[in-house]
């Protein structure tokens, strides 16, 4: 009996450690949750044909799909600018005492846009739209979202660091602005890779899709 009781205690301790590890990563988990919430709300907004969905769909149709293919450098910059704007927003939110509260609005918004565009393409072009999403949107979008989510984690940490520094209730060891902006530079690599992948896919497969 004592052996069985010991095993149960060890198992409970093992599960409690896993739960604690899970909760300790909340700074990365919450942005991921907001991302999926944005994607789902974008699809729901498309199904209900909300006003914001129509704005996103019109912009995607008239600006993204209708434009002519540019030079390789121009295409790369075009795909780099959009997610870079989101990263800049996350960066400056992290320098605010309210950053930990507002930062998750960024992956929510980006996820909403992905959801809107995906629903629009599938709803209007079915299999052709789905193929476009799988080839042209999802590889690019996933890498951009990865960068945004990782930067959100750093933004929340920086905002907490500022709050604790001001209130003098505590401080993070080995953390500060230098670590903060360096982490953003590292995570920006995912945006660069995403833009390069999107540019290559556009030149390889862009001609297969005409809407």
Which residues are covered by each model-predicted region?
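Cytosolic juxtamembrane amphipathic/interface segments immediately preceding
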Residues: 9-25, 170-179
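N-terminal signal-anchor transmembrane alpha helix
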Residues: 18-53
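Alpha-helical transmembrane segments of multipass membrane proteins
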Residues: 34-41, 86, 143-147, 190, ...
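Perimembrane loop-to-helix junctions flanking transmembrane segments
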Residues: 53-74
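Hydrophobic alpha-helical transmembrane segments
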Residues: 77-110
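Conserved mixed alpha/beta catalytic, RNA-binding, or beta-rich assembly cores of soluble enzyme
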Residues: 103-126
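Alpha-helical transmembrane segments of helical membrane proteins, especially in multi-pass transport
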Residues: 136-160
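Terminal transmembrane helical module of multi-pass membrane proteins
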Residues: 151-211
């Amino acid at each position: 009996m004592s052996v069985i009781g010991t095993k149960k205690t060890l198992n409970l301790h093992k599960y409690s450690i896993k739960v604690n590890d899970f909760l300790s990563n909340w700074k990365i988990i919450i942005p991921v949750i907001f991302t999926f919430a944005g994607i789902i709300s974008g699809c729901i907004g498309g199904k209900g044909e909300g006003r914001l969905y129509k704005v996103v769909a019109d912009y995607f149709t008239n600006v993204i799909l209708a434009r002519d293919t540019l030079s390789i450098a121009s295409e790369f910059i075009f795909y780099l600018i959009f997610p870079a704007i989101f990263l800049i927003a996350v960066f400056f939110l992290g320098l605010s005492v309210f950053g930990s509260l507002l930062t998750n609005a960024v992956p929510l918004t980006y996820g909403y846009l992905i959801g809107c565009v995906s629903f629009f393409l599938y709803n209007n072009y079915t299999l052709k739209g789905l193929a476009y999403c799988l080839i042209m949107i999802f590889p690019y979008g996933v890498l951009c979202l990865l960068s945004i989510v990782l930067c959100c984690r750093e933004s929340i940490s920086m905002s907490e660091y500022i709050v604790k520094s001001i209130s003098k209730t505590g401080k993070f060891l080995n953390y500060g602005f230098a670590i903060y902006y360096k982490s953003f530079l590292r995570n920006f690599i995912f945006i660069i890779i995403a833009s390069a992948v999107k540019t290559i896919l556009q030149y390889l497969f862009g001609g297969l899709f005409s809407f």
